[in-house]
Amino acid sequence: MNHPSATLLQRAQWLGYLGLVPFITGMALMILLDDTRLVAQAIHNYAAVILTFVGAIHWGRALNNGDTTLMSFSVLPSLIAWCSLFLEPQKGIPLTAIAFVMLLFLDRNLYLEMAWFKQLRTRLSILVCTLLSVSWLYI
């Protein structure tokens, strides 16, 4: 799938950017509200869910390629996300942001043949980390 159909590419982009809506909404609420505890927790929870989702991409690829090493690695993001939920958002949000960056570096090396995917993942990861960072500033 080095050259996806235009429909697949558009759908991946549309759904990827749609996944940013909770981060954008959460960040806006963090800026606007005086009491941000509930919003910070919601952002943290959503970041953990999305981190798990991004890790699951590797699970799918491992199943497709029969790569047991990649399959074993694919559960690490969900474990990091789960562990982060035991922390307060002021510590858990940065942990998930760091995990997103680490996962991005891995993806950029694993998906060399899929330039479109690398580009989309890079853009989405930068936006997610930026939105998480700005939200964190308002905790």
Predicted regions and their residues:
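Non-cytosolic membrane-interface motifs at loop->transmembrane helix junctions
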Residues: 39-43, 69, 116-123
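Mid-membrane cores of alpha-helical transmembrane segments in multi-pass membrane proteins
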Residues: 68-83, 93-105
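C-terminal ends of transmembrane helices
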Residues: 2-5, 54-64, 103-116
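Small-residue-rich segments of transmembrane alpha-helices in multi-pass membrane proteins
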Residues: 21-26, 72-83, 121-137
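N-terminal membrane topogenic signal
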Residues: 4-18
